From Swiss-Prot:
Cell wall formation. This is UDP-N-acetylmuramate--L-alanine ligase. Belongs to the MurCDEF family. GO terms for cellular component: cytoplasm. Phosphorylated by StkP in vitro. Dephosphorylated by PhpP in vitro. Pathway: Cell wall biogenesis; peptidoglycan biosynthesis. Keywords: ATP-binding, Cell cycle, Cell division, Cell shape, Cell wall biogenesis/degradation, Cytoplasm, Ligase, Nucleotide-binding, Peptidoglycan synthesis, Phosphoprotein. Pfam families: Mur_ligase (PF01225), Mur_ligase_C (PF02875), Mur_ligase_M (PF08245). Its EC number is 6.3.2.8.
Length: 444
């Protein structure tokens, strides 16, 4: 008899992916969340998964309850009711740690790029063999017959500590989440603790100084662009408007040429990590090569649309390193167009900690438009930073805009608009799309 799972906070990206995966494995799944629309709920609704408002009546002692990490007794009625009545529940990462023991598990960790890399690994492996996976863009796939399980491994609040995968990629280490981590050293220590839990193979970006200090009982394989000191090396790069082609060598042995239809140097590294892991795990590289060619990307990572001949890119980038990577990808695909960045800072703590870095990253665009800072539910705005503080540090043409008036964005010809952020930047994007549609309607 299949279990019934109830998710408290089912619209969260990891939670929705897990709900979809369990649903596809034949379990009954339901969940609760706020009424505000979030991009993950489309997949849940298409699967026929019930989404309820938060209410203590949703809970049944016979259910297995999985709670989002942000919810506590003081901010959620279901958690409060469960605590008061002795109803047990597991946090997302606690459940995942026990769930993965039944599979050959492959994790993807890192400050940046883990969702794209998890998506790439999941795409390739699931086309080769039966695979279940969880991606941080809200995508999940479950199979009752799967031997392999691919998942995204999140460092925030050390949520990845219950995980003991056979294989893992770590894309990079960078200072982020300043509301939790106190320093780069603190971030490193978290990743190093995680690395010690890998059992068969750890694949790390060899040109990251912090990752060079990582220790693990599992064999460590370094990947990168530089031949010296790396095990898996990407070379002979050909970057074009159709994607990237490159050759991979393993300790001097030519593994052949590969092509990915995605953009930016960071995606070449993501692919090299995937190639290295699957080669080491014994998979046929001809199959890996074949399925890399069809990887189209993940949700909210360089997602493109064209509205009345205007190219709009939506990306989750909310850290300076991610912004630079996204703008690099835009320039690769659209070398003759003006690159216009529309960015919403995410959390006051991150904006304060990385203000100069944000300015440097955004200056890689040709023009910059800023939305008001999106505060996290975990923090209070003490007025220590405003978006104008960031605007004052940007050298390129720049302006602060509101969601009610995005018309300043029209002041560009032959431009690509790159909307970036982890808050509600999509509301600005949709406002701009409506404006473009109305202009066309008026002309017609």
């Amino acid at each position: 008899m299949s279990k019934t799972y109830h998710f408290i906070g089912i619209k969260g990206s990891g939670m929705s992916a897990l709900a979809l995966m369990l649903h596809q494995m034949g379990h009954k799944v339901q969940g609760s969340d706020v009424e505000k629309y979030y991009f993950t709920q489309r997949g849940l609704e298409q699967a026929g998964i019930t989404i309820l408002p938060f209410d203590e009546k949703n809970l049944d002692g016979d259910m297995e309850i999985i709670a989002g990490n942000a919810f506590r007794p003081d901010n959620n009625v279901e958690i409060a009711y469960a605590d008061q009545n002795g109803i047990s529940y597991k946090r997302y990462h606690e459940f995942l740690g026990s769930f993965m023991r039944d599979f050959v598990s492959m994790g993807v960790a890192g400050a940046h790029g883990k969702t794209s890399t998890t998506g790439m690994l999941s795409h390739v492996l699931s086309h080769i063999t039966d695979t279940s996976f969880l991606i941080g863009d809200g995508t999940g796939r479950g199979s009752a017959n799967a031997k392999y399980f691919v998942f995204e491994s999140d460092e925030y609040e050390r949520h990845f500590m219950p995980y003991h995968p056979e294989y893992s990629i770590i894309t990079n280490i960078d200072f982020d989440h300043p509301d939790y981590f106190t320093s780069l050293e603190d971030v490193f220590n978290a990743f190093n603790d995680y690395a010690k839990q890998i059992t068969k193979g750890l694949f790390v970006y060899g040109e990251d100084a912090e990752l060079r200090k990582i220790t693990s009982d599992a064999p460590i394989y370094y990947y990168g662009f530089e031949a010296e000191g790396n095990d898996f090396v990407a070379s002979d790069l050909l970057r074009s408007i159709t994607g990237s082609t490159f050759t991979v060598h393993f300790r001097g042995q030519n593994l052949g040429q590969f092509h990915i239809p995605t953009f930016g140097r960071h995606n070449i590294m993501n692919a090299t990590a995937v190639i290295g892991l699957l080669y080491t795990a014994g998979f046929d590289l001809n199959l890996v090569r074949e399925h890399l060619k069809t990887f189209a990307g993940v949700k909210r990572r360089f997602t493109e649309k064209i509205v009345n001949d205007t190219v709009i890119i939506d990306d989750f980038a909310h850290h300076p390193t991610e912004i630079i990577a996204t703008l690099d990808a835009a320039r690769q695909k659209y070398p003759s167009k003006e690159i216009v960045a529309v960015f919403q800072p995410h959390t006051f703590t991150r904006t304060i900690a990385l203000l100069d870095d944000f300015a440097h990253a955004l200056n890689q665009a040709d023009a910059v438009y800023l939305a008001q800072i999106y505060g996290s539910a975990r923090e209070v705005d003490h007025g220590d930073v405003k978006v104008e503080d960031l605007a004052n540090k940007i050298n390129k043409k720049h302006q602060v805009i509101t969601v009610e008036n995005v018309s300043p964005l029209l002041d560009h010809d032959n431009a690509v608009y790159v909307f970036m952020g982890a808050g509600d930047i999509q509301t600005y994007e949709y406002s701009f799309e409506r404006l473009l549609s109305n202009l066309t309607s008026n002309v017609q």
